[in-house]
């Protein structure tokens, strides 16, 4: 068997430090995406072509051929694969349709081909070329109705993030997962005309800082000002600096938590305060720091006073404990509740998607948008 994507793979180190312009225009890297992990069964089909199942990438004849429109039901039983009721001994399986044909996984179409691994159950992995991968990512990360400048900026950011973070899930046997932990990916069922055009018009374009591909993290909405990396990750990153938006205090949100639940969460975190007496936090002013806020205004910590003790809780811990949209908030006690009122959604690093839309609405190009959010970067076409 000759899998059609294999000719596109280069060693990962070549992606992290690239001299633009020397890579063949026909080359592009392959991404492996974890679609399902630890499952007991899955279903596959080829709507317009047969499916071919192999036990080895170099195998010339398939182990099994599934006619088009018919289902391949794979079950993982007692550390073996059962294919349509028959057991096969194999370390892993490869499933391929005809070239340029999609494979349906549980009735959802995916480009490329599939690997099945034994790993605490069965892991389903989609092998897909970078540009095909982006066709299924960009429409899930940004609405296709948004301006082309924003869609193009998102395409470049998503491509850069994917290439920088290949092998993020190496221990699980693939590069990236299909959730917001990496990038949301739903295969070809997600594709739209507008986002495909945005990907195609930026083909191979990647962001660099001093010759190295950047970690192009992005988020939904900064609330008025993005954040610097050291305030979130604890380490300085030269291209991830706090920058202002065209608009402040966008998309306000409110979240209420009962005082009883708040105290319970504190105790579960090892902070014994007893009956709550008060909460101390400087008032929010976007773009203005204080002893308990970063220079962008995000909460670094709050002080909680109780009749049995006091404690300090970080903004990131509060966001995690109470599923807050961001750390750009005020907090007050109201009757028997603790009320968080804030702005923005996400960690605040890098590209703000709503901010990108605002810039694109005013006619800014993808490069102008990206240069605003990622300091001193260059954008190069590597294939």
Residues of each region from the PLM?
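Conserved, single-site charged/polar hotspot
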Residues: 2-383
